Amino acid sequence: MSFTLVHLSDLHYNAYPLHWSEWNFKRGLGAANLFLKRAKQHPLSRNRKLVEKVSTMDWDHLVISGDLTQLGLEQEFEEARRDLEPLLQEKDRVSIVPGNHDRYVQDPEGQDSFDQYFQEFFGEDEIHHRNLPCGWELIGWDSCHPAPWYSASG
């Protein structure tokens, strides 16, 4: 039996904080890095071409492992969801695991944008487990959490 697994990683959808409540020291540093360097390394046009390509393929399961976003902003998650939507139609064929940039800082209102936009592809537990039709087992671990301003770890 043939089984095609597609794995995408480090898409880094990026945007700059629009509202004062989204700014903090860590996001300020991240936005400066984005402006000076990262936006050139992670052009959004590349992500759209990637989605187009994968849309034309005959795949059995799609895994997207973080980082979906650069600064963990809601508008980044919104854009990622909108762009990836053609690939997300069959939820039982998609698994998405967050990365450290997806849990970049503690949201002042206690919201988790990853969960808001992509939890249905991971679940509520720290460990995501799925039995794939080919007999493989897919296990994803969400070890990410907001880290202090001086740390990029999650």
PLM segments and residue spans:
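N-terminal active-site segment of His-dependent metallophosphoesterases
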Residues: 1-77
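Extended active-site neighborhood of metal-dependent phosphoesterases/phosphodiesterases
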Residues: 78-154
